[in-house]
Swiss-Prot record:
Naturally occurring in which organism (per UniProt): Mycobacterium tuberculosis (strain ATCC 25618 / H37Rv)
Gene Ontology molecular-function annotations: 2-C-methyl-D-erythritol 2,4-cyclodiphosphate synthase activity; metal ion binding
Catalytic activity: 4-CDP-2-C-methyl-D-erythritol 2-phosphate = 2-C-methyl-D-erythritol 2,4-cyclic diphosphate + CMP
UniProt protein name: 2-C-methyl-D-erythritol 2,4-cyclodiphosphate synthase
Site (Transition state stabilizer): H38, T134
Binding site for 4-CDP-2-C-methyl-D-erythritol 2-phosphate: D12, V13, H14, H38, S39, D60, I61, G62, T133, T134, T135, D136, R143
Residues at which a divalent metal cation binds: D12, H14, H46
Listed EC numbers: 4.6.1.12
Organism superkingdom: Bacteria
EC main group: lyase
Length: 159
C-alpha cells in the first residue's frame, strides 16, 4: 500500500557565544560569533534535523542527539544530518524536500544562500531551500543575543 507523504516541522534557538566559531546553514562564517550548544550550534541544521525526524515519526533532535550523550559533544551539523538520513532510511523513508529559514540579524547569509542550499541538499539527498529574515529589532534575535531557525521537511515512503 502506498503511503502519503509526511510533513514535519522543526525549530531551534541558541544564544550567541562570543569567540565561538559560527556554523550556520552548514557553512562556517569566520567573521561572526557562533551559537552556544552541545554540538556545533548550527540552528538551521538543528531545525532541519527536527523537521525530518518529526516527519518520519522518529521524535526530535533531543531524543536522538541528547545533550547528556558524550558521543554527540561538538558534533558537526553535517554529521547530524547524515545520521538523521540513515535513521529515516532504516525506517523506510527518504526526504522529498525541505525548507529552512534563519531568523536573526547576523551573519547575513544571502550572499551564501546558493552555497548553503547545495551543501544541505547534498547532505539530505533532496532539494533544500534556504531563506533568512529578521525580527526588526524585537526579541533575542533582534537584539543580536541569539539566532533561531524554523524548518519544514517532506518525507516519502520507500515502501
Amino acid at each position: 500500500m502506498n503511503q502519503l507523504p509526511r510533513v514535519g516541522l522543526g525549530t531551534d534557538v541558541h544564544p550567541i557565544e562570543p569567540g565561538r566559531p559560527c556554523w550556520l546553514v552548514g557553512l562556517l562564517f569566520p567573521s561572526a560569533d557562533g551559537c552556544a550548544g552541545h554540538s556545533d550550534g548550527d540552528v538551521a541544521v538543528h531545525a532541519l534535523c527536527d523537521a525530518v525526524l518529526s516527519a518520519a515519526g522518529l521524535g526530535d533532535i533531543g531524543e536522538v542527539f541528547g545533550v547528556d550523550d558524550p558521543r554527540w559533544q561538538g558534533v558537526s551539523g553535517a554529521d547530524m544530518l547524515r545520521h538523521v538520513v540513515v535513521l529515516i532510511t532504516q525506517h523506510g523513508y527518504r526526504v522529498g524536500n525541505a525548507v529552512v529559514q534563519v531568523i536573526g540579524n547576523r551573519p547575513k547569509i544571502g550572499w551564501r544562500r546558493l552555497e548553503a542550499q547545495a551543501v544541505l541538499s547534498r547532505l539530505l539527498n533532496a532539494p533544500v531551500s534556504v531563506s533568512a529574515t529578521t525580527t526588526d529589532g524585537l526579541g533575542l534575535t533582534g537584539r543580536g543575543e541569539g539566532l533561531a531557525a524554523i524548518a519544514t521537511a517532506l518525507v516519502v515512503s520507500l515502501r
